């Protein structure tokens, strides 16, 4: 019966529905997935988290880039290249991937609370420091916790960092200017229709080719189907439209993250995407000026996925 409770092996009471969801989870980075509950906007939201590697090894938390096709699976090649003596952890942001996708007001504060909850969940009794690796638009979410949490970080690596969503980047206008687009896509009937048009395979292919991947051979029909599957899951339109319209932006100008990076209590490593769109590349360079270490890879905004092996080698190189 829906809503009935069962006792798991760990002795935790869960609803039958929750147990079924956990059993149906798939590995995305070659590890073991699990579901946890984190309170966001006054309600518990189911977040899917995955661990890979040695339980007692050096801890690495991998933050997926925020995008219409955001998924922890972006880190699979990176995870394959890392030493198995490390413990790698990644998760799907609320509203994306395998995590719950409720119709809530998504913004940078919600995702910052989510990341703080993940860090608290991972905190061990011996206070082992965590290596943060943040990709793309997840970077300002992590930097938003610089003052609060970074004393517990061994380092933060920011990969092809961005701080503005696509529409604010293209137009130069703040995210508030596009709140009407968010309201439109959130409507019943018309909202799903508009979102479906925006996640057609030709649109996704254009976006991935121009901004995300360098190698066009990656844009196979099978891979495009998988990207479309991620983007069209029930409830996915709410967080996705927030991202596209700048609703997830932590700030409207680069001065904010220049201030935040100076609040860090750990080293910062910026990995530049050499083939990023010009405006995004300029903003990456301003952040790199404040970093302790700078590297560059000939990729675009999805370099952590396309060049995961090279990225892993670059990060661990002394």
Which residues does each PLM region occupy?
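Hydrolases whose catalytic domains are alpha/beta-hydrolase-1, hotdog thioesterase
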Residues: 141-145
């Amino acid at each position: 019966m829906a809503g009935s409770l069962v006792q798991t092996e760990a002795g935790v009471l869960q609803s039958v529905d929750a147990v079924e969801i956990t059993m149906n989870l798939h590995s995305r980075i070659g590890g073991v997935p699990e579901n946890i509950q984190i309170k966001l906007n006054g309600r518990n939201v189911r977040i899917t988290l995955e661990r890979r590697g040695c339980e007692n090894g050096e801890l690495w938390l991998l933050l997926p880039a925020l995008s219409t096709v955001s998924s922890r699976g972006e880190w699979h090649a990176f995870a394959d290249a890392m030493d198995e003596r490390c413990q790698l952890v990644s998760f799907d942001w609320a509203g994306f991937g395998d995590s719950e996708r409720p119709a809530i007001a998504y913004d940078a504060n919600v995702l910052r609370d989510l990341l703080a909850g993940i860090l608290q969940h991972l905190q061990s009794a011996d206070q082992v420091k965590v290596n943060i690796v943040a990709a793309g638009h997840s970077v300002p979410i992590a930097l938003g916790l610089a003052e609060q949490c970074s004393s517990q970080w061994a380092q933060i690596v920011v990969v092809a960092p961005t701080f503005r969503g696509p529409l604010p980047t293209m137009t130069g206008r703040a995210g508030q200017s596009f709140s009407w687009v968010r309201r439109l896509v959130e409507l019943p009937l018309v909202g799903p229709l508009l979102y479906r048009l925006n996640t057609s395979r030709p649109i996704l292919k254009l976006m991935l080719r121009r901004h995300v991947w360098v190698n066009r051979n990656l844009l196979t029909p099978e891979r495009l189907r998988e990207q479309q599957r991620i983007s069209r899951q029930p409830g996915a339109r709410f967080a996705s439209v927030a991202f596209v319209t700048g609703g997830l932006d932590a700030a409207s100008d680069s001065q904010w993250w220049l201030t935040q990076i100076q609040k860090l209590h750990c080293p910062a490593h910026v990995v530049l995407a050499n083939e990023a769109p010009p405006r995004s590349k300029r903003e990456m360079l301003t952040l790199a000026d404040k970093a302790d270490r700078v590297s560059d890879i000939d990729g675009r905004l999805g370099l952590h996925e396309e060049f995961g092996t090279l990225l892993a080698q670059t990060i661990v190189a002394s």
